[in-house]
């Protein structure tokens, strides 16, 4: 899964190379510019072609971050996001069986317009928005079985986070035993799940 955030890049003036980090060097050492759709597509075409040659079954899911970059203003942000959306659309045309898109950007901007879906800075999604996006994502890509496994894993995670008032009590010891049984049942159905740390912690708490 790859998330595009911005189509703006920094280039070293001396070399013309795009940098991933300015390393606290003076801003005057760099040019900041908007990449074109063709530039991004060309880079990712060679990358995806190489990856799928090694793994023909590879599926790549793209998203565009709904967080707005307003340094250059709202219009420049829209130009950047539009460039990214057009890039992904082109990549889907080039790799229709390998490249897919999840519309996180559109969901936040078109469906979640209320203030409660944004943090105090009015740029970042609120926890409520994140949960909504996660539900949309899981409904789109997860099978019913996967959702059930996630529910059971989350149930165990919440149990493990429980902080007892009386850790030596018989009731808490039974509670720990129930967690171990839940883990054993889940591993019995899905042996690839790793609950070693949780199991060890339960046994430590059972035998202080």
Regions found by a protein language model. Name each.
Residues 120, 136-208:
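Conserved catalytic region of serine esterases and O-acyltransferases that act on ester linkages
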Residues 10, 41-60, 93-98:
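Secondary-structure boundary elements
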Residues 49-78, 111, 153-163:
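Active-site segments of SGNH/GDSL-like serine hydrolases
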Residues 59-61, 82-114, 136, 150-152:
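Extracellular serine-dependent O-acyl
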Residues 2-16:
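Short, solvent-exposed beta-strand-terminating loops
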